[in-house]
């Protein structure tokens, strides 16, 4: 009896531990899955920008769309400033989701800063900047590249303009930083991609015919989607499955050719990249420019006064 009780106790303990692990897995892992898209690039590429200047997000998001960037022309050392990435798209647009249903578009962005520039810590943010970046999870591309920032996917309804709080370097403390003009590169996408990192196509694509022939039947599936039955010139029938949510461009009785599009393009999103320049300005240079400006103004005033004095002297001599 004691042995049976001990066995039952062990079984209950194993069951409890297993259940606890499952719950922890759901709590810890599931939220990260929604942020998996930038991780695709982080895991596959050491740098998000290729030698050609192309940002790697374009490998999965094939359609080209605009993206805008706003940043100050110049900043002082050890200063927090904001860079705004704008990802415009039609507010009425709906994308096809993985299960074939329609939903709102998600957005994501990557900002490639000069070395030394990085995400500003929370304790350096102003109240206004904290409000602008609330509920935004911006992270470095990698532990070694804190000058490259990524975010997404996040809902595009309220995030078509994403504010990145940036901290500029101080050349007095960072010997790698210099007072210079630097480029800033940015990439932004809206909607799902067409290619997974594995190379497989998503359902956000045009489906091409796998064979030529006549469509003799289009079968509607219970869970959505279609099976197209095609008979070729040799009277051999083949079938092709179309994922749920796609809109067919063909009908029964149509004759199709190899690689012909069978559905309308479901993609309403796309990726774009842009760039701007920023100057890390020396405070001493600004002070020098201010001194030079006031010196120039004083010199002009002095010149005008001397000219008027000279004219008075000339006028007095002419009166004699």
From Swiss-Prot:
Signal peptide start-end: 1-35
Principal place of residence: plastid
SUPFAM superfamilies (UniProt xref): Cytochrome f subunit of the cytochrome b6f complex, transmembrane anchor, Cytochrome f, large domain, Rudiment single hybrid motif
Quaternary structure (record): The 4 large subunits of the cytochrome b6-f complex are cytochrome b6, subunit IV (17 kDa polypeptide, petD), cytochrome f and the Rieske protein, while the 4 small subunits are PetG, PetL, PetM and PetN. The complex functions as a dimer.
Compartments where located: Plastid, Chloroplast thylakoid membrane
Note accompanying the cofactor annotation: Binds 1 heme group covalently.
Keyword Plastid: yes
Binding of heme, residues: 37, 57, 60-61
Name of the featured protein: Cytochrome f
A GO MF term: electron transfer activity
Gene3D superfamilies for this protein: 2.40.50.100, Cytochrome f large domain, Single helix bin
Claim: Transmembrane helix is one of the keywords in the record: yes
InterPro entries: Cyt-f_TM, Cyt_f, Cyt_f_lg_dom, Cyt_f_lg_dom_sf, Rudment_hybrid_motif
Protein family according to the UniProt entry: Belongs to the cytochrome f family.
Keywords, comma-separated and alphabetical: Chloroplast, Electron transport, Heme, Iron, Membrane, Metal-binding, Photosynthesis, Plastid, Signal, Thylakoid, Transmembrane, Transmembrane helix, Transport
Its biological purpose: Component of the cytochrome b6-f complex, which mediates electron transfer between photosystem II (PSII) and photosystem I (PSI), cyclic electron flow around PSI, and state transitions.
Membrane topology: Single-pass membrane protein
Named cofactor requirement(s): heme
Biological process per Gene Ontology, one example term: photosynthesis
A Pfam short name: Apocytochr_F_C
GO terms under cellular component: chloroplast thylakoid membrane
Superkingdom of the organism of origin: Eukaryota
Lineage, broadest ranks: Eukaryota, Rhodophyta, Bangiophyceae, Bangiales, Bangiaceae
TM ranges: 286-306
Gene designation per UniProt: petA
């Amino acid at each position: 009896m004691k042995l049976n009780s001990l066995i039952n106790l062990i079984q209950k303990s194993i069951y409890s531990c297993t259940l606890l692990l499952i719950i922890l897995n759901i709590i810890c892992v599931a939220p990260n899955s929604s942020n998996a898209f930038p991780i695709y690039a982080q895991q596959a590429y050491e740098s998000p920008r290729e030698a050609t200047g192309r940002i790697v997000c374009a490998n999965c998001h094939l359609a080209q769309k605009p993206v805008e960037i706003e940043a100050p022309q110049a900043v002082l050392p050890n200063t927090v400033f904001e860079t705004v990435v704008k990802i415009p798209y039609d507010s009425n647009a709906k994308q096809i989701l993985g299960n074939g249903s329609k939903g709102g578009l998600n957005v994501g962005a990557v900002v490639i800063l000069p070395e030394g520039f990085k995400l500003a810590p929370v304790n350096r943010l102003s109240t206004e900047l904290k409000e602008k970046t609330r509920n935004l999870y911006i992270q470095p591309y990698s532990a070694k590249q804190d000058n490259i920032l990524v975010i997404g996917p996040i809902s595009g309804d309220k995030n078509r303009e994403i504010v990145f709080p940036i901290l500029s370097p101080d050349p007095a403390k960072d010997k790698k930083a210099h007072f210079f003009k630097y480029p800033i590169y940015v990439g932004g996408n809206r909607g799902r991609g067409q290619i997974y990192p594995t190379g497989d196509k998503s359902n956000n694509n045009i489906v091409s015919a796998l064979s030529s022939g006549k469509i003799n039947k289009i079968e509607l599936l219970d869970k959505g989607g279609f099976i197209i039955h095609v008979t070729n010139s040799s009277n051999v029938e083949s079938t092709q499955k179309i994922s749920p949510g796609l809109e067919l461009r063909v009908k029964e009785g149509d004759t199709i050719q190899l690689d012909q599009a069978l559905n309308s393009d479901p993609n309403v999103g796309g990726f774009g990249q842009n760039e701007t320049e920023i100057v890390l300005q020396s405070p001493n240079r600004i002070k020098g420019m201010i001194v030079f400006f006031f010196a120039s103004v004083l010199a002009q005033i002095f010149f005008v006064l001397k000219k008027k004095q000279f004219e008075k002297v000339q006028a007095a001599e002419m009166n004699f």
